[in-house]
Regions:
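Glycine-enriched loop-and-adjacent helix/strand subsegments that border the catalytic/binding cleft
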Residues: 32-38, 123-293, 334-352, 360-362
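Loop/turn positions that initiate beta-strands
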Residues: 306-308, 368
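N-terminal Sec-pathway targeting helices
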Residues: 1-12
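Short helix/loop segment immediately N-terminal to the Walker
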Residues: 288-301, 326
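Short, Lys/Arg- and Gly-enriched loop/turn segments at beta-strand edges
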Residues: 184, 318-325, 358-361, 378-386
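Short, well-ordered loop/turn sites that connect or cap secondary structure elements
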Residues: 302-304, 365
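N-terminal non-catalytic cap/leader segment that marks the start of a structured domain
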Residues: 12-145, 150-151, 157-158, 165, ...
Length: 386
């Protein structure tokens, strides 16, 4: 009798919850704010910022001074094989390169976006979470945080593989790299700063399984956001005369099959790159992060190597939303009333039920879709999902 009473109580509870709160909610709406004017990628005036790219010519990487960009084609002046943007700027000087861009454009040639090499260089970056207020609100995290991201940069025209069981999500970001290693805040202040467009793909299923209640610890993020094709980078490295003004005004967008998903400017960052560097250098040497089951530091030996990127974080408009109170309550009742506690723990059961509902909603990236990150002066990235 007692067992039948418990069963009846559970069935009644599930029925009531199902009628009131446990029906699958509609897909979460996009919380991003969108500018009315369409974004047309171009390049900065040379006096504002110098734009560089690289391409293979006779199987050797050549540096280009970019003098124009339209319709996924860059026009650039070949500065020679093996040249580095930062070294070239130091050797020739900003004024000479501005003059070259303005008076020697007849030396330029066309280079399709697909021929340009990645602006990123290193296989380990410092990534940033919830550094745009609207994005922090949509994923219910209060403050920005960092984590190491592993995996080589891929070019501006590329692919990303959605593996079995993966809930693949996009993020568009601004990345920075520097002309020297950063070991102290003085290094950041003295460094020449270059910026490029970048993407940050995420396996939301893996992240949901690994993340802890202390989201700002970054645990789970390195595993869910690292991989051979999870870091696409734009075609240009842009070195502005005034980096703060340039970043603040830079607009970045994301679309999926032409549907707008993200739209923001760098001014929306909670922490600018100087503040991000300060936090990174203050805490980065401690092995407080996790990747593939091992404790790792944010930056090895407390130094961001030359070539490694510091990432801005993404604005609002991602697909994922964390489980809310309704989801947790419904999952808890289901776990108890189906005797799930005899098979697995409470948290895994609730998570797997939540992930199953997300997969059934079919809102995450699917093979055949195209993700496009675009920017006002950093170029664009076109990714085919496979």
């Amino acid at each position: 009798m007692r067992k039948r009473g418990i069963l009846a109580l559970c069935l009644g509870a599930m029925g009531a919850l199902g009628a009131v709160v446990c029906v699958p909610p509609p897909p979460a709406g996009n919380t991003a704010s969108f500018e009315t004017e369409p974004l047309r990628p171009g390049i900065a005036d040379p006096a504002t910022a110098l734009t560089f790219a690289s391409t293979l010519i006779d199987d050797s990487p050549h540096l280009l001074l970019v003098v124009g960009y339209a319709d996924a084609v860059a026009r650039g002046i070949d500065l020679g094989a093996g040249a580095d943007p930062f070294d070239t700027l130091q050797r020739l000087g900003r004024d000479a390169l501005i003059g070259m861009a303005r008076t020697e454009a007849d030396r330029s040639a066309d280079f399709p976006l697909a021929r340009l090499l990645p602006a990123g260089q290193a296989a380990r970056q410092v990534a940033t979470g919830t550094n745009f207020r609207e994005h922090a609100q949509e994923v219910a995290v209060e403050r920005p945080f960092n984590f190491p991201k592993f995996g080589p940069p891929t070019p501006a025209v590329t692919t990303v593989l959605r593996g079995d069981g993966v809930l693949l999500d996009y993020e568009g970001e601004i990345c920075a790299r520097f002309d020297r290693p950063l070991a102290a805040t003085e290094d950041f202040a003295a460094a020449v700063k270059g910026f490029f467009l970048c993407g940050d793909f995420t396996d939301r299923a893996l992240l949901t399984r690994l993340v802890t209640e202390d989201v700002e610890s970054g645990i789970g993020f390195s595993d869910a956001k690292s991989g051979p094709d999870f870091f696409p980078t734009g075609p240009f490295l842009v070195i502005p005369a005034d980096w703060r003004a340039f970043v603040a005004d830079e607009r970045i967008t994301t679309s999926v099959d032409g549907d707008p998903r993200q739209d923001a400017r760098g001014a929306g960052m909670t922490l600018d790159f100087a503040a991000l560097a300060e936090v990174m250098l203050k805490t980065g040497a401690s092995p407080d992060w996790q990747y593939q089951g091992q404790q790792v530091p944010l930056i090895a030996a407390g130094v961001l190597p030359q070539g490694a990127a510091l990432m801005s974080g993404t604005p609002a408009g991602v697909i994922y939303r964390p489980p809310d109170t309704r989801e947790i309550v419904c999952g808890s009742v289901w776990h108890i009333c189906t005797a799930g506690f005899l098979r697995e723990g409470f948290r895994p059961a609730v998570i797997e039920r939540f992930l199953g509902r997300l997969a059934a909603a079919d809102v995450f990236l699917r093979p055949g879709q195209q993700v496009r990150h675009a920017s006002s002066q950093l170029g664009e990235i076109i990714v085919e999902v496979r």
